Amino acid sequence: GAGKTTTLRAICNMCSTSGKVLLGEEDISRAGTADIVRKGVAHVPQGRGTFPELSVLDNLMIGAYTRKDKEVKDDVDRWFEIFPRLSERSDQLAGSLSGGEQQMLAVARALMCRPRLLLLDEPSLGLAPLIIEDLFERFTTLNKETGLTMLVVEQNANLALDMADYGYVIESGEITLHGSAEKLKNDPAVQEAYLGA
């Protein structure tokens, strides 16, 4: 591939890297994955990565494993409010959920650690168009309401650029283009190669 998933894995120190990964001013390139989560990075991997044999509620609690505060229950309630289908299925095994519900669960679980940076790897993969639209509207709302930064890896360039402030085009592991989402959407080369124009 182009290296999009590898980029997310490198940020989380899940693969060998050279150079530095900075979160703000802090070098996190040698930190353990649990420390990276504590520092404010949450990763929703491609394929959702829920724990199918655990309940929806147990999956959410795993997302808060690095937290020691007393507000975990409040956050569970908050994500149940934002994703009401999860609340309806809180005792149900994650493996029995639909693809869209599993993706909502994976996102809510990642948000349980109260990240500063949310990494989303192909969040639309295998989902029906209406589910994708709903999910991306929720991402946009979450960003506007909380200021949460999201790094979204997405094959659907139109979808990604519609919600993005800034975009990167990666080919063969190299950043070949970058700029504001608006600039990229209006670039004739991007339109021809990636947007089907």
Which residues are covered by each model-predicted region?
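Glycine-rich phosphate-binding loops of nucleotide-dependent enzymes
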Residues: 1-197
